[in-house]
Amino acid sequence: MVDEHYIDYSQLLAQLLDKDGELNETTVSFLYHLFPSDFFVRAMSLIDSNNMFIYVFERDETSAALTTSVGTEPDEVETTTETLRTSPSPPVASEQELGNAVQSSALINTLYEKPQSVLHRLIVKQEGPQSPPVCVDLRHWFCSCDEYNTLFEERMLTDEEPSLYSKATTELRAGASITDSFASMPPKGASRRYFRHDIIMCPHLLAFAILLQTTPELLTYFTHKAATVYLITIQNLDEWLKLHLNVVI
C-alpha cells in the first residue's frame, strides 16, 4: 500500500466530537458518505440503542469499588443502570464516586494504549428476545452476525486465488507515518497489518471501531456523558465464565 494515499479513518472518526465535547453534526454528515450501505447510520444507531456492552475482566483486586457485584446479563445491567439514572444525584460527589471516575478513565486509557493487555469481550444485545447476542472481535475484524458472514462467504471464499490472507489484509511498510488504528490487526514483525474493511464490514464492527479505535474521548462520551454504551468490569472469575457461557448458549 502507498501510505501517502491512505485515508486515516481513526483521525476522521475522532472528529465526531467538537472542541466543546459535543457531537459535530458537520462531521456526522460527512461520515455518512464515507462508508457504504448506510453502515455509518446503522452503527450510530447501535451506539445510541443501549444494546452495546464492553465487558472487561479486571484482575486488580484494588479496583473492587468499581466492579463489586456486577451482573453479566444484559437485562440485569440495563435495569441497574436505569435505576442509577433515575435516582436523585447527591449535590456533591463522594470520594468513592470520584475514585470510580478516575478508575474508569484509567481503564478507558488502557483499552486504547494497551488493548492486548486487557481481557475484554464486545457484545451487542439484539432486539428479538429469541435472538442470540452478537459477538465482535475487533482485533481480528470478526463479527458473528449474519451480515458479516454472508459478505465473507461472497467476497472471500468464492475464489481460491489469491490466498485468503492476501485478500483480507493489507500491510504498511515498516516506518510508515500512518497512525491509523481503524481495522488494525496484531502486527506481523515490523509491518502493521489492517483488515480490508472496504471489502467486509458490518454495523457492529464499525460501531465498536468508533468506540475503541479512534480516541478515548469518544469512548468516554458514549459511556459516561451520553451513557448509551455499557463499560462493565468483572473481577469474579465465575461471573466472567458465566458471561462466556451465556454467549455460547
UniProtKB/Swiss-Prot annotation:
Localisation per UniProt entry:
Nucleus
The record's Gene Ontology biological-process terms are:
DNA recombination; DNA repair
Major location, coarse class? nucleus
Q: Where is this region: Disordered?
A: 68-95
User: What are the UniProt keywords, alphabetically?
Assistant: DNA damage, DNA recombination, DNA repair, Nucleus
Signal peptide positions on this chain:
none
Q: Name one GO cellular component term.
A: nucleus
Its biological purpose: Plays a role in a RAD51/RAD54-dependent homologous recombination repair (HRR) pathway to repair MMS-induced lesions during S-phase. Required for error-free repair of spontaneous and induced DNA lesions to protect the genome from mutation.
Family classification: Belongs to the SHU2 family.
- For this entry, the protein name equals Suppressor of hydroxyurea sensitivity protein 2
Source species: Lachancea thermotolerans (strain ATCC 56472 / CBS 6340 / NRRL Y-8284) (Yeast)
Name the gene: SHU2
